[in-house]
């Protein structure tokens, strides 16, 4: 864009305080969704289907405590006009078809003596036809494709009842990769909780991840028939997802009085396997943040309404029961972890951050958090340490999912009331069983689901999506409920949209090209003239010692709300930032004239961080964003000094070089610093 073009719409700012949404539990000032529900070696989870066969995932919304309170009633909103349906897989009430989604037709033109394949699908998170699924809704669209480079259970319906010893053949570039004997329908994996069979006519085999790649086609032959017409699946991204866990121990919580780090720093192995089974990724890598944990005695909650709905100024908290509403501390911690993720250069990448919050009340007792928060599409969420329904729901928000019932009402979710009525069935490779769209008999919600769930013609309950009251709809032995095919497709789209750190790329980065079904080299660019950072805030130095510094500041002067958090140090990344003592750096961020002319134009550049190291050396960094009126960086916002407005409060996070110990951290007042650095700037805060 040219410097003189119309300003872009203001992006919701996790550092500041956008207006709350109408359904917040208490009016909030953060663009996040809520849900009332020691350093270690990175864990890598590749696809486990083959092993299982052989051995046996910015607006505010609120949820209720156990996730069931938000389930719609059986007589929910009238259905929206669905996407054009083309039967090709199981329905919600009758196994064997796919309503609500458009599927690609199977190849035809079978000749005499040639085996015919009526249906071919691949079970990974869901049973998906080889051509994928797609939806066009009044206010949204989505698709779900087979996941590239992930094992799959292939399901084949053969046209001839007398086919003998059918075999699945894989081909690429005219070469045969191999063949797999198909197991008969009688050997099809069972359904969870001993439920109804998925189908009675599907032959099956486990296809290795190496064959589940673009360019591979599959055909079926038999000893008494020649090979069928080949089908080439349309694949989705082969990207992995890295899940980074950073536990926050708050208000004196430690291993002696609270769940220890050994249990909070990562989900256990079985839970990691179940997360992988639910998320449409080729690989799941779980790691504890290299800092281990973040221990805080004080947390600053930004301006927000209390439990009665009355607006409150920003305030410090030193015990969980001091917060004035149920989401105050969670909101503050979500802002911190979101900004820390950006400061570490992880913002555009294929990763998710989750922060278990371990907190004490004023009596020194461990406090039950009772919920979580997730920034919609932000890649970050906070919640409890149990890694159950709260976790999977909040990370759903981090993937870009809103509450499914709300989205259905807005024409952006295809199934009534946020249910799975119309979704294809799911599949779990760890248990090696199908996941019905109906609530199983062993689910905790089963006995009373009729009063809160959508019902089929026989009065049976459809599952709710985890983004709308689904917790409790899973079979005994599972931690997580089943996502709909539609929401899984949206998670796949989020993953496909991410930048991948890719050593095989000439630029070091790649992105998935959906049309080409391949990764393409990606060159980072600076969008919007630097309005939201340089080169998408990707690292300029990676794997180096860093100190992360977080500062909260109340321009209204709210008591205790201006605070420099204790820094923490680890091996991380540095993104492009600017030194206001450097004339070249000041020129680069000069409003409307510099190399990055919009870097300071949004809400100003009026504050500088000065870090003095133990050896006496110093580093200075401009803190982007402040309290100016949008697109008028020389004039204060009308609410900049209103203590009840989010516009008076900001949280910055920045990484600085960590090769030396810090002696002092100071926040300096440097108005319109692109015009020049004051010789003796006022020190606003010091630590």
UniProtKB/Swiss-Prot annotation:
Organism listed in the record: Burkholderia pseudomallei (strain K96243)
Record key words, sorted: Hydrolase, Metal-binding, Metalloprotease, Protease, Zinc
Cleavable signal peptide: none
Official protein name in the record: Dictomallein
UniProt cross-references to InterPro entries, sorted A to Z: Dictomallein (IPR051256), Peptidase_M66_dom (IPR019503)
Cofactor note: Binds 1 zinc ion per subunit.
Gene that this polypeptide is encoded by: dtmL
SUPFAM superfamilies on file: Metalloproteases ('zincins'), catalytic domain
The keyword Zinc appears for this protein: yes
Family, as annotated: Belongs to the dictomallein family.
Chain spans, region Disordered: 1-45, 73-112
Domain Peptidase M66: 233-501
Pfam short name (any one): Peptidase_M66
Enzyme Commission number, as recorded: 3.4.24.-
Source organism superkingdom: Bacteria
Top-level class of the enzyme under EC nomenclature: hydrolase
Active site: 394
């Amino acid at each position: 864009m040219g410097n003189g073009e119309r300003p872009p719409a203001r992006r919701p700012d996790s550092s500041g305080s956008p207006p709350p949404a109408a359904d917040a539990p208490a009016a909030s000032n953060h663009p996040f969704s809520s849900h009332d529900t020691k350093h270690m070696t990175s864990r890598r989870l590749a696809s486990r289907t083959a092993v299982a066969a052989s051995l046996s995932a910015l607006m505010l919304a609120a949820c209720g405590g156990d996730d069931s309170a938000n389930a719609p009633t059986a007589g929910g909103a009238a259905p929206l006009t669905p996407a054009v349906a083309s039967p090709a897989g199981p329905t919600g009430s009758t196994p064997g078809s796919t309503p609500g989604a458009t599927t690609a037709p199977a190849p035809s033109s079978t000749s005499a003596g040639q085996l015919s394949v009526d249906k071919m699908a691949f079970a990974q998170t869901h049973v998906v036809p080889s051509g994928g699924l797609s939806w066009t809704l009044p206010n949204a669209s989505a698709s779900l494709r087979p996941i590239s480079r992930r094992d799959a259970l292939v399901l084949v319906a053969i046209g001839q009842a007398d086919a003998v010893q059918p075999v699945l053949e894989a081909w690429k570039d005219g070469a045969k990769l191999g063949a797999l004997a198909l197991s008969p329908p009688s050997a099809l994996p069972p359904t969870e909780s001993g439920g109804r069979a998925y189908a009675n006519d599907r032959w099956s085999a486990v296809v290795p991840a190496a064959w589940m790649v673009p360019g591979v086609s599959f055909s079926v032959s038999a000893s008494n028939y020649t090979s069928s017409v080949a089908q080439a699946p349309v694949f989705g991204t082969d990207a992995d997802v890295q899940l980074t866990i950073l536990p926050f121990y708050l208000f004196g919580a430690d291993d002696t009085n609270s769940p220890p780090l050994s249990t909070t720093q990562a989900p256990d192995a079985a839970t990691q396997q179940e997360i992988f089974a639910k998320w449409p990724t080729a690989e799941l890598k779980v790691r504890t943040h290299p800092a281990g944990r973040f221990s805080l005695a004080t947390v600053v909650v930004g301006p927000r309404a209390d439990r009665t709905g009355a607006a409150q100024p920003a305030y410090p908290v030193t015990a969980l029961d001091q917060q004035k509403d149920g989401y105050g501390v969670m909101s503050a911690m979500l802002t911190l972890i979101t900004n820390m993720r950006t400061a570490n250069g992880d913002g555009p990448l294929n990763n998710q951050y989750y922060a278990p919050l371990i907190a004490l009340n004023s009596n020194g007792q461990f406090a039950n958090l009772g919920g979580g928060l997730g920034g919609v599409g932000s890649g970050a969420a906070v919640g409890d340490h149990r890694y159950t329904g709260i976790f999977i729901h909040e990370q759903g928000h981090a993937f870009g999912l809103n509450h499914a019932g709300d989205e259905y009402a807005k024409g952006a979710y295809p199934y009534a009331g946020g249910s799975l009525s119309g979704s294809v069935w799911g599949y779990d490779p760890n248990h090696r069983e199908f996941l019905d769209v109906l609530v199983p008999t062993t689910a905790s919600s089963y006995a009373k689901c009729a009063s809160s769930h959508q019902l089929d013609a026989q009065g049976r309950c459809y599952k709710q999506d985890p983004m709308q009251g689904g917790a409790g709809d899973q079979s005994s032995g599972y931690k997580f409920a089943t996502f709909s095919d539609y929401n899984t497709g949206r998670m796949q789209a989020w993953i496909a949209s991410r930048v991948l750190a890719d050593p095989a790329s000439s630029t070091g980065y790649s992105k998935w090209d959906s049309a080409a079904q391949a990764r393409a080299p990606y060159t980072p660019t600076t969008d919007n003239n630097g309005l939201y950072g340089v080169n998408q805030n990707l690292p300029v130095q990676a794997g180096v010692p860093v100190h992360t510094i977080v500062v909260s500041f109340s321009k209204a002067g709210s008591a205790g709300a201006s605070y420099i958090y204790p820094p923490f140090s680890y091996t991380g990344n540095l993104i492009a930032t600017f030194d206001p003592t450097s004339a070249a750096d000041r020129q680069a961020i000069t409003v409307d004239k510099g190399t990055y002319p919009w870097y300071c134009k949004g809400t100003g550049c009026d504050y500088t961080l000065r870090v003095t190291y133990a050896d006496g050396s110093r580093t200075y960094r401009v803190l982007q964003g402040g309290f100016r009126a949008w697109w008028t960086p020389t004039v204060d916002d009308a609410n900049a000094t209103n203590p009840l407005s989010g516009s008076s409060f900001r949280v910055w996070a920045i990484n600085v070089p960590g090769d030396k110990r810090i002696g002092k951290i100071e926040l300096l007042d440097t108005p319109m610093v692109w015009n020049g650095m004051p010789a003796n700037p006022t020190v606003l805060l010091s630590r």
